[in-house]
């Protein structure tokens, strides 16, 4: 996608294959800052601190982090330590574990001296596959938008939650890929952007939509139901951090409430995700671990002060107890359809297996 009109991806590997550069998303939308990741520990920190976030981008970053780790030492012990460290950073995002398992399955049988080159090649393949899959999701989603248009020149009002755009992937995004596809095809589209407290990832969505020229409006999370009730929303689309085998969806906390509001107002609720987000080994949403993050994300508000200096302000009295779950689970019956790189399917085991019959072996 574009930043100031320049095609840009969220991460880039150095030609010497010793490091990667990532966008520090904790500094957006106020500053675009690139960070060099040159050690295993830096890669783990980038994922844990949400300098990179979004399940597909987490997976790609972890793959490169493993390649970086093997630059220093490629022994069996180093491989196991790197997989364990990276795998513990974000428990809900299944793309992380998918990418690490894929890397380890390829690297483990190789002699240590062959692992470094193979690791960098496989990490690059994971990144390129992510771009292609997300572009395909966009085209499948565009067909759904066309079905919603009932009058020439009608503006489609799409609501989203959190950030599942290109900042959450290597490029294109998942939930926003159909939005970009529609905009680029000349379909009038407007996006209601939910702020997504407490980390306000909706600001990232608004920032990237602005970069691409897509009309949008930022809203408070609690305004979503009112907009639906007043007929101002044609569809809701979100990404996912993990989709269970039965079609239950783990996504940013607050997703479940939007799905409930959609059901009450007859609005289709779509989930967009690539194969790497599908966890066929997880039978249902109740089996998905829910990450609990530091309460200071809730206690503190980050922004720029009157001088334009980044600042953090405490909004709660000292010692106030808070709960800060990062995700919730939306049951499959609230999901109109799941959009993947292979097509659109019902949110059910049968629906997913129709697109991925090779998984029926399990």
Curated annotation (Swiss-Prot):
Which InterPro entries would you find in this protein's record? IF-2B-related (IPR000649), IF-M1Pi (IPR005251), IF_2B-like_C (IPR042529), Initiation_fac_2B_a/b/d (IPR011559), M1Pi_N (IPR027363), NagB/RpiA_transferase-like (IPR037171)
EC number in record: 5.3.1.23
Q: Where is this site: Transition state stabilizer?
A: 162
| Uppermost EC category | isomerase
Pfam families given in the database record: IF-2B (PF01008)
> Which reaction(s) are listed as its catalytic activity?
5-(methylsulfanyl)-alpha-D-ribose 1-phosphate = 5-(methylsulfanyl)-D-ribulose 1-phosphate
Which GO BP terms sit in this record?
L-methionine salvage from methylthioadenosine
Q: Establish whether keyword Transport is in the entry.
A: no
- Give binding positions for substrate: 53-55, 90, 201, 251-252
The active site is formed by: 241 (proton donor)
Q: Tell me which NCBIfam families the record gives.
A: eIF-2B_rel (TIGR00524), PRK05720.1 (NF004326), salvage_mtnA (TIGR00512)
Regarding protein family, the annotation reads:
Belongs to the eIF-2B alpha/beta/delta subunits family. MtnA subfamily.
Name of the protein in its database record: Methylthioribose-1-phosphate isomerase
């Amino acid at each position: 996608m574009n930043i100031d009109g320049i095609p840009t991806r969220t991460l880039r590997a150095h030609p010497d294959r010793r490091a990667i550069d990532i966008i520090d998303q904790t500094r957006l939308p106020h500053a675009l800052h690139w960070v060099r990741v040159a050690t295993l520990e830096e890669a783990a920190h980038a994922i844990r601190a949400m300098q990179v976030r979004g399940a597909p981008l987490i997976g790609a970053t972890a793959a490169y982090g493993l390649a970086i780790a093997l630059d220093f030492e490629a022994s069996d012990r180093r491989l196991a330590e790197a997989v364990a460290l990276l795998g513990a950073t974000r428990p809900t995002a299944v793309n992380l574990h998918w990418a690490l398992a894929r890397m380890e399955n390829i690297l483990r049988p190789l002699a240590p001296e062959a692992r470094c080159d193979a690791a960098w090649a496989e990490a690059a393949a994971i990144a390129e596959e992510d771009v292609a899959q997300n572009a395909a999701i966009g085209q499948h989603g565009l067909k759904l938008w066309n079905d919603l248009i009932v009058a020439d020149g009608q503006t489609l009002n799409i609501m989203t939650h959190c950030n599942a755009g290109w900042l959450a992937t290597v490029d294109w995004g998942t939930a926003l890929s159909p939005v970009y596809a529609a905009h680029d095809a000349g379909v009038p589209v407007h996006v209601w952007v939910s702020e997504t407290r407490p980390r306000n990832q909706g600001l990232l969505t608004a920032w990237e939509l602005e970069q691409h020229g897509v009309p949008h409006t930022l809203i408070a999370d609690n305004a979503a139901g009112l907009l639906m009730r007043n007929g101002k929303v044609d569809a809701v689309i979100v990404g996912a951090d993990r989709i269970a085998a039965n079609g239950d969806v783990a996504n940013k906390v607050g997703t479940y409430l939007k799905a409930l509001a959609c059901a009450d107002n007859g609005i289709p609720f779509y989930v967009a995700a690539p194969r790497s987000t599908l966890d066929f080994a997880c039978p249902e949403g109740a089996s998905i671990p829910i990450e609990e993050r530091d309460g200071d994300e809730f206690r503190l508000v980050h922004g720029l002060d009157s001088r334009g200096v980044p600042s953090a302000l405490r909004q709660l009295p000292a010692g106030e107890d808070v709960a800060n779950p990062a995700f919730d689970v939306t049951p499959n019956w609230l999901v109109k359809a799941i959009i993947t790189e292979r097509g659109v399917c019902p949110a059910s085991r049968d629906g997913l297996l129709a697109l991925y019959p090779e998984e029926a072996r399990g």
